[in-house]
């Protein structure tokens, strides 16, 4: 997948709702809004209803890309990348936060690309206590290295702090 979203600027509604009825309403009411470029689904819907059912509900109303955010996918061993890529079948792209190191990051990116998934990589989160400078576990250099490795793997889409 070369470009996840077809436009240079877009809105990506985050479908963090608790059931398929609320998802249906959200998608129906936004899919024709100019500027909506994709939909982001997360683990609440995916684990409760399954990715195929969630994707099917969205596809009833739009063919816009569906981005799956597993709330920190790529934080496990490198070998699970291929299993993850198979498990998210139906999504067009995934968000990875590879905090477990370069081996995992590269393996998961390669597995997702092999499965024809778009890849978006995040390295920094903005909640209190995340970064070492805010008494968190993750140091600032590590987050920068995550982005550098992803760019080296030809990733062009990133989750970056907006504040």
Spans of features found by a protein language model:
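Conserved N-terminal beta1-alpha1 strand-loop-helix module at the mouth
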Residues: 1-68, 72-77, 89-90, 149-156
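Conserved anion-binding
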Residues: 7-8, 75-76, 80-163
């Amino acid at each position: 997948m070369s470009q996840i979203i077809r436009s240079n600027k877009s809105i990506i509604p985050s479908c963090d709702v608790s059931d398929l009825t609320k998802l249906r309403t959200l998608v129906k009411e936004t899919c024709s809004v100019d500027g909506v470029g994709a939909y982001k689904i997360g683990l609440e819907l995916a684990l409760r209803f399954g990715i195929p059912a969630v994707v099917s509900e969205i596809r009833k109303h739009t063919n816009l890309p569906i981005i799956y955010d597993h709330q920190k996918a790529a934080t496990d061993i490198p070998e699970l990348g291929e299993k993850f890529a198979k498990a998210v079948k139906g999504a067009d792209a995934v968000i990875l936060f590879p905090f477990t190191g370069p081996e995992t990051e590269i393996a998961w990116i390669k597995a997702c690309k092999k499965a024809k998934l778009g890849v978006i990589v995040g390295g920094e989160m903005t909640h209190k206590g995340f970064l070492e400078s805010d008494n968190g576990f993750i140091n600032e250099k590590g987050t920068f290295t995550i982005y550098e490795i992803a760019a080296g793997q030809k990733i062009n889409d990133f989750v970056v702090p907006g504040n």
